[in-house]
Amino acid sequence: MATISVAAADRRVSALILLVGFVVFLNYVDRGAIAIAAPLLKNELHLSATRFGLAVSAFFWVYAPIQYIVGWLCDRFCVYRALAVGLAIWALSTFLTGFIGGLASLVILRVFLGLGESVTFPAGSKIIARHVPTEQRGYANSLMAAGIALGPALGTLAGGTITAFFGWRPMFWIFGLATLFWLVPWLLTARELPAFGSRNSEPRVAAGKLLRQPAMWAMGIGHFTTTYGHYFILTWLPLFLVQSHGFTISQMTLFATIAYLAQGAAAFFFGWLSDRWVRSGRSEAAVRRGMIAGSLAAMGLAILLLAFATSPAAILSLLVFYGVGAAPCSINLYAIAQMFAGPRAAGSWIGVQNATGNLSGIIGPIITGMIIDATHSYWSAFILTAAVCGAGALWFAFGVPKIEQVALD
């Protein structure tokens, strides 16, 4: 990841922003590990599609609702330490997943994984809003967006390779231990900042005032549509390729990796492009609204066409199209939220928005699993997901109110 210039040209802050991008990468490596293991794990633990969907959704039972509180904590206490504690919890949960013996232990560890990972986006957005000027936030947020894509890309490549040669349990052990090493550069970098270890001295925003903002709930609804599509691909793509199209684990790994690499590369491009347009004098609100609406439309179209694809070439082309189309989504999703909230309320705002948006992670996997078990096909699940993405495109185009910093005093 390239170094981003920041307001004070401070190397420590530049390193901090890079580490925020990298922690999102680790977040998605560990979150997506269950999908890589799924073809073998489901058989070994004798899980139906519905029970597997239940295990996947368990991550969100805590991940989504706890963010209402986590965002508030990031605005009031040391956000740098909060992120470190969250990572330690999820890394240990990932490691211990390699020892599970059934559905119950899998569900429990998925819950703790969700608890640890819940800190990532409220903390990351708080740090970006605090340290990065508005005309550079497209690129700063592209680091997080690239992590969302490159985590599954390299995680699928590494995890698929480990699983193919050694089984799915060693994959969880290796991923969990590797994630813990992030704490070393993070603590060495963050502890040099004046704000490290102290309570936040910024003026507080009353929770009631924040919760009465229609724009925040509108963003939460839009966020729901983005995550519904993203988690559908992240969770079910490996099973879809293996079960519906007869791919081997190695073939599935290759196709998924190429798609996610395309998404990661496109994230850097769209982050740079959005900042360039803003610096050239275009309305930042119009740029970011247009990009996210177009992104959701592209995601929906790609998912719809995947339901009808039959040849490996067509599937790969559509997966790459999905990846490139999805890239602007996360960049602008968080950049718009940072515009609405401003630096002092960014943690709380993202916490509420992320919590609302990630409710899709609770219901989506269960709905998808039930559809697959009932129809013995992925077709209807793909159609439903495409429709949700299409609705999201319309919502961001016409449903989200005027994008500007709201009055919170």
Which sequence ranges carry the predicted segments?
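Extracytoplasmic gate region of multi-pass secondary transporters
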Residues: 34-35, 214-270, 330, 334
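Helix-breaking motifs and short loop linkers at transmembrane-helix boundaries and internal kinks
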Residues: 46, 78, 99-105, 133, ...
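Conserved MFS/SLC helix-loop-helix module at the cytosolic interface between two early adjacent transmembrane helices
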Residues: 65-104
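Helix-loop-helix hairpin linking two adjacent transmembrane segments in secondary transporters
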Residues: 144-188
